[in-house]
Amino acid sequence: MFSNTSSSGTLDASGLHLPYCSGVYCYGNLFRTNTALTIAPKELPATTLTKQCYQGMFYNCTNLVTGPEVIAATTVDDQSFRIMFSGCSNLPSTPRFEIKALEGEDNCYNMFYNCTSLTDINCTLPATTLTEMCYRGMFNGCT
């Protein structure tokens, strides 16, 4: 929908409401490689995520400077956050997480890969149920 977009202007998606979606890959790649995106939706309110729900959602949005404040999910399925912010080289902070159970594999794989401007890590990673490799490479390439 908003992927692979570039323009001389900027895109502020802070007012965009993304409701619960029960399908696989619901919001996957929604803004992928959108270089106009500077402000993400303020909140991602879904509490139960389906497989690959937010995978690659902001992948390579190199001008993103304001990510979501909160990811409200408490239960997530396979690869829900895989490469979600990967390549967002101007993103200064992470969202706050409310995750209690990571019920699939590779949930946060390379989630913030190469986010070289990260200085504020807001996620406390409160999950009490973990699966194999759930946080694998989450902050790879961050300096």
Please state what every model-predicted region is.
Residues 1-143:
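Negatively charged
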